Amino acid sequence: LEVTLGHVRAAAAAGADLILTPELTNGLSSSRDRQRALFRREEEDATLAALSVEAKIGGRWLLIGSLGLLTDEPDGRFANRSFLIAPDGGIAARYDKIHMFDVSVSETEIYRESEGYRPGARAVLATTPFARIGMTICYDLRFPALYRRLAQAGAEILTVPAAFNHITGAAHWEVLLRARAIETGCFVLAPAQTGFHPEHRGKGRRTHGHSLAVAPWGEVLADGGTEPGVTLVNLDLSEVGKARRRIPSLGHDREFD
């Protein structure tokens, strides 16, 4: 939490109007026991409370990429929930990750996110004074229909906080983000976890890093690299309209068999 607060304060001091953090800001772990020890209900979560106060102090919009939260699920599964915090410290929007990362990247890297987290069921478009924001999380990135629906509903910015695996990240992260930006004519902002996240006995997982900002025409505007820190980028929202006028594909859907 202290590291996150330091980065948020640095971004605010640099003049950021919208600040974003990665997926599972309050703790990235594959251990169910550690998750149960770390996670709290939304109303009791210390990270949510502290970052909401920080947004209010700085008068900034803050997207908490996501938090792992306890739920009332009978099977004990958690929520993976993104929050958009307004400058008054209030929660402007919530989004629960829809698509669960149930994959076998290799013989030694197997993930079954749905065993620990319940999937969301609702797309979320948030309205702010500067833009309409479509909220997504990590593995959602591989499902373009979600992004198309958000763009057709009016999204100008799409957020993709993530903890992308280092193998899939190296192969697919930038290409997928650029594709979603090009397909929708939206800015795509993707704050990402980076580095090695240790578990017990020296085991753990490695995330890809490379927080990216992508323009509606597909250009990468900023790349945060693999070191923890703050990446700043200026967005000209008129570029959304320009890209969509050049390629108005959001209005060209056709039914087919």
Regions found by a protein language model. Name each.
Residues 1-2, 6-88, 92-96, 165-183:
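Cys-nucleophile CN-hydrolase/nitrilase-fold catalytic domain and related Cys-dependent amidase chemistry
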Residues 42-64, 132, 138-231:
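CN hydrolase (nitrilase-like) catalytic-core segments centered on the catalytic cysteine
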Residues 64-66, 81-84, 124-126, 211-213, ...:
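Short beta-strand scaffold segments in enzyme catalytic cores
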Residues 71, 126, 254-256:
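Small-residue-enriched flexible segments
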Residues 73-153, 166-175, 179, 246-249:
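Active-site catalytic loop in hydrolytic enzyme cores
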Residues 90-93, 219-221, 241-242:
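Short helix-loop capping/hinge motifs at secondary-structure junctions, enriched
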Residues 240-257:
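A conserved C-terminal secondary-structure "cap"
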